[in-house]
Design a protein with these regions (language model features):
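Conserved catalytic-core segment of NTP-binding enzymes
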Residues: 145-147, 154-213, 365
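Short Gly/Thr/Asp-enriched flexible loops that form oxyanion-binding sites at enzyme active sites
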Residues: 60, 146-156, 443-447
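Active-site-proximal loop/hinge segments that shape catalytic or ion-binding/gating pockets
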Residues: 435
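Beta-strand->loop->alpha-helix junctions that form or flank phosphate-binding loops
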Residues: 195-196, 210-230, 251-256, 293-304, ...
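Short functional linear segments
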Residues: 1-49, 56-67, 74, 110-112
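Nucleotide phosphate-binding/pyrophosphate-handling subdomain across enzymes
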Residues: 40, 131, 136-141, 148-159, ...
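C-terminal helical cap/extension that packs against the catalytic core
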Residues: 198-207, 211-216, 319-321, 328, ...
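ATP-dependent carboxylate-amine ligase catalytic core
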Residues: 25, 32-40, 66-153, 169-171
Length: 451
């Protein structure tokens, strides 16, 4: 097998380009067959949805790990380092592992159509998880579901976090069409857990689930969560499940939406625990007592979950928050959180809020800014180092038409972060948002120069 450096490996991968999106499963299936079908060597949870996929995946992976299992977690995109996409028990894989997996997949990629970036990285994830003998893999889709490269799995549970209008050029221009695409991950006789709220979309998912003889568990109907109180940088809530009530559950991930995300993860774990207990009753000898989901391990795994770049308090002086907020729903969630926590009307320690915003050119930037502008005192518009970044001057020009907030353009994320931090006043709060790419570049800058 050829050998290349880690840098050369990444250069080859990124040269495949983001716009090489091909929604079909034949290519990935062919590659995996040549690799010995690594995706069949572990149990899996498969997660689709518009927002919250990564948080839910992280909760489940943390809980399974705290329950004694060896767990792989595959998410995208990465914030700083490509290896973040492939984690095993909370640790990203090594550079050497990435190169080995890439070369193995590259050698198997000899079909009529060359694989895309996402197909190759997905095959790499399955190769790495099989090689490391993980017992569980928690797998996040890239886009959609039905024809997403991850949809070669036969999971134990599928999850659709929520739905909104996104990637319409690929997934369809109505919620019902998008629901049908994401519902394509539903497998025969495999439970679906979902937080989808729109009735028309729920009906689509119910129809697919019925055809596949798959039970469906819906947040708000079959299980729910009730927030009890906020703790320092976290939330406590009661989980009302399908057959259990767990009080004083705690997540350190911030925002009202994380209570629902937590509940979805807990519903998955409740189903897995029920299945585990049924197996124990059948044959007590086959169960490893050190590898068991319990209420205690679930509680611990939930409370320990971290998910970088999502309402992450990364610096205390000045207070700096990073949140990807890369689409309309995420921007709305962020604006609600900021309005509550950092508005000028706050009775305790009122603060001035500076936002650093950069948005990609395929996002509804006008609608996103309508949510974000009212909560800020000043906005610095910038752009990530990626071709799809929207010109920050375009963002500023629109901002000027809808409000009187003070604006500034600083083309480079590093310079924008440095300017905001060095010019921060007493009690200042800085929030960096609009794109996971902006979040990643800002996070790297802060960790390097300010911590």
């Amino acid at each position: 097998m050829e050998t290349i450096s880690y840098a050369e490996c990444l250069k080859e991968m990124f040269a495949l380009g983001r716009f090489g999106i091909k929604l079909e499963l034949e290519t990935i299936a062919d590659i995996l067959k040549k690799l010995g079908e690594p995706e069949k060597k572990f149990q899996s949870i498969h997660i689709a949805g518009t927002n919250g996929k990564g948080s839910i995946a992280s909760y489940i992976a943390s809980i399974l790990s705290c329950s004694g299992f060896k767990v792989g977690l595959y998410t995208s995109p990465h914030l700083i380092k490509f290896n973040e996409r492939f984690c095993i028990n909370g640790n990203m894989v090594s550079n050497e592992d990435v190169v080995e997996a890439y070369l193995a997949v590259k050698q198997a990629d000899i079909g009529e159509r060359k694989a895309t970036f996402f197909e190759i990285s997905t095959a790499m994830a399955f190769y790495l998880f099989a090689k490391e003998n993980v017992e569980w893999a928690v797998i996040e889709t890239g886009m959609g579901g039905r024809l997403d490269a991850t949809n070669v799995l036969k999971p134990e549970v599928t999850v659709i976090s929520n739905l909104s209008m996104e990637h319409t050029e690929y997934l369809g221009d109505t919620l019902e069409k998008i629901a049908a695409e994401k519902g394509g991950i539903i497998k025969y006789n495999t439970p679906l857990v979902t937080g989808v709220a729109q009735e028309s979309a729920i009906e689509v998912l119910k129809n697919i689930a019925q055809k596949e003889s798959s039970p469906i568990y819906i947040y708000g109907n079959d299980f729910t969560a009730i927030k009890s109180c906020e703790v320092e940088l976290g939330t406590k809530f009661t989980y009302n499940g399908m057959g259990v009530v767990w009080e004083n559950m705690e997540t350190q991930l911030l925002g009202e939406h994380q209570v629902q995300n937590s509940a979805i993860a807990l519903a998955v774990c409740e189903l897995l625990m029920n299945k585990q207990n049924q197996q124990t009753n059948k044959d007590i000898h086959i169960i490893d007592k050190n590898k068991r989901l319990t209420q205690e391990s679930i509680r611990k795994g939930l409370s320990l979950t971290k998910w970088a770049g999502r309402l992450e308090y990364i610096l205390k002086k000045p207070l700096v928050i990073i949140d990807g907020a890369h689409n309309l729903d995420a921007a709305e969630n962020l604006s609600k959180y900021l309005a509550k926590q950092h508005s000028l009307t706050a009775t305790n320690n009122p603060s001035k809020l500076t936002m650093i915003i950069g948005i990609l050119n395929d996002k509804p930037y006008k609608e996103m800014l309508k949510y974000l502008l009212p909560v800020a005192d000043q906005i610095i518009f910038t752009r990530a180092n990626i071709d799809r970044s929207l010109d920050p001057i375009v963002l500023e020009e629109f901002a000027i038409t809808i409000g009187s907030v003070k604006t500034k353009v600083i083309e480079n994320v590093d310079n924008a972060v440095e300017y905001a931090i060095k010019n921060a006043t007493e009690n200042a709060c800085i929030c960096i948002a609009g794109s996971l790419y902006v979040a990643g570049e800002a996070r790297e800058k802060i960790l390097k120069d300010f911590i």
